[in-house]
Amino acid sequence: MIVIQDEKNLLKASIYAEFTVSDYRELENAIVAKLKAQRKLNLLLDFTSMAGFTLDVAWEDIKFTRSHPHDFARIAVLTSDQWRSWLGWLATAFTDAQIGSFTDPGPAEAWARGA
């Protein structure tokens, strides 16, 4: 399950239980809609309640990120698991966004907003 919050200069997505390709497509649609209103997007991905993800999510993420290499300013990854932090770092190969990994939501959101 995914919950997406669209705020002025930040799109926040919280993933609960298993992250499915249906959830990911919902996130893609929200990103594309937000990009119609602004040139670059700040994104906060909260993986703290995510139990795992399906393989098709990983593939969809690679395709989507490669098709939007310059559309993100900052991507904050909120997680308590080191391997999810590494996945965020790996995404830097496909985007020129600044990517930060955080364990605390306050600093994650402040950084994602550019503060």
Predicted regions and their residues:
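Amphipathic, Lys/Arg-enriched alpha-helical "gate/interface" segment within cytosolic domains
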Residues: 1-115
